[in-house]
Design a protein with these regions (language model features):
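Conserved Rossmann-fold NAD(P)-dependent oxidoreductase catalytic core, especially the SDR/UDP-sugar
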Residues: 8, 17-66
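Substrate-positioning beta->alpha
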Residues: 21, 72, 105, 122-142, ...
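NAD(P)H-binding glycine-rich loop region in Rossmannoid oxidoreductase-like domains
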Residues: 1-17
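NAD(P)-dependent short-chain dehydrogenase/reductase
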Residues: 83-89, 93-127
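Mid/C-terminal beta-alpha module of Rossmann-like enzyme folds, strongest
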Residues: 137-203, 220, 225, 235-253
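Active-site Tyr-X1-5-Lys
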Residues: 27, 62-91
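Conserved catalytic-site region of short-chain dehydrogenase/reductase
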Residues: 3-4, 39-50, 95-99, 104
């Protein structure tokens, strides 16, 4: 997962070449079912429309390095279906939740807020979903998903200020000023410079700001209908995430 703007060799190697290696091995070994975890970012954005599943994937139709490589990889999966592989695709939205020690950007957002490291938040939001619901949906796709079909595993749109309000109701904290996206863009070079000096990834990028204002009206009706997918309210997700973080690290009470 990356919020970088440019496609790197590492992204191509992991997201595209790595996926094709797995597909080739699965086809050669005649595996019973192959489930590919794509992303809603791989789905071409159509402004003002509810976005549902598609079989049209192209890096030229999506924005950002991560989205482009996931679109390329998803296209590969559907090519292997035509070769005889029993494969299905799931498209999670913005994943958040406990038990993720991989450096998840949204978990880091929650952590930084609780530790009083966020000076402000940005106007905008996205569709955020619990990692446990994504896991359950992926397992259901393995059991019930139809060959060659795609399933969106989303929840609903939450404004960033709404997410932080939930965090505040669980863990306390102060209200943050909400910056317009244009102001966050002006500060972007400074944020990237500070992150580079500290040898840390930037808090946000041009691409992550784009996602906060993009169309995130994803429909999970198909997954609910065919897989029994039922995403939970984000309050439960954030409550459990903070409880997990407090067991893992000494967060402020």
């Amino acid at each position: 997962i990356s919020i970088a703007d440019k496609v790197t060799d590492d992204l191509l190697r992991v997201n595209v070449e790595g996926t094709e290696n797995l597909l080739s091995a699965a086809l050669g070994s005649r595996v019973k079912k192959f489930v590919y975890v794509s992303s809603v970012h791989a789905i071409p954005e159509q402004p003002l429309r509810v976005l549902s599943e598609t079989d049209d994937f192209s890096p030229d139709k999506v924005q950002g390095a991560y989205a482009k490589t996931k679109a390329m990889a998803t296209e590969k999966v559907l090519e292997y279906v035509k070769k005889g592989l029993n494969a299905v695709v799931v498209h999670p939205s913005g994943i958040l939740g406990p038990y993720d020690g991989s450096g998840n950007h949204l978990v880091q957002l929650v952590t930084d807020y609780v530790e009083n490291k966020l000076p402000a938040c940005v106007k905008g939001g996205y569709d955020f979903v619990d990692v446990r619901d994504v896991a359950a949906g992926t397992l259901a796709a393995a059991e019930k998903g139809r060959t060659g079909e795609c399933y969106i595993l989303s929840n609903r749109h939450y404004e960033i200020r709404e997410v932080l309000a939930i965090v505040r109701s669980v863990a306390g904290g102060r209200r943050l000023p909400v910056l317009p996206v244009w102001m966050a863009k002006l500060a972007l070079p400074l944020m990237e410079f500070i992150a580079k000096c500290k040898k840390k990834r930037p808090l946000y990028t041009k691409y992550s700001l784009y996602t906060l204002t993009s169309n995130d009206k994803f429909s999970h009706d198909k997954a609910s209908r065919e897989l029994g997918y039922r995403p939970r309210d984000l309050y439960e997700t954030i409550r459990d995430t903070i409880a997990w973080l407090r067991r893992k690290t000494p967060l402020p009470a």
